Amino acid sequence: MTRDEVQIWFDNNKINGSISDEYSDTVAKGNFVSQSITANTVVHQGDKMTVTYSLGKEPSTEEKNALKKAETYSEMMHMSKQGIYNQLTSSVEGFTKEAAQYAIDNIDADWKANALEKAKTYQQTMSMSKQGVYNQLTSSVEGFTKEEAQYAIDHLDD
């Protein structure tokens, strides 16, 4: 059962249920790990039950640090996915490609919002045209996708 299906089952059966997550070296991310009540046990309304899902393998310290650094670049500098990856793997930051990819795969970022914030900065501080902003956003320097850059241009005057 998916997490959503488990929650619906809890609600429909009036079970005092919770869903938790834990790292697992043997169970793939998102898959079922365990439940607090043994399978085939009759449960009653109001019973407490926890179902646990896997977060996948626990990240290394380097992966955790790369993710924290990526979050900072996203939140403070409104960088693109590609820009963050390039920065993390640069000689300045020195993270491995694997740690940088882990960060990119696990960051909770709104890339379109980042593109918009970066576009506003270019327009306000450098007096750039919309086409110039678009070109800058999609350049190898900034690394936003065409879709992210177009979103930024479309919402620049909102």
Language-model segment annotations:
Residues S74-K81, Q123-K130:
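Extracellular glycan-recognition/adhesion modules and their associated mucin-like linkers
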Residues M1-E75, Q82-N86, S90-G94, Q101-K118, ...:
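Ligand-recognition elements built from short beta-strands and adjacent flexible loops
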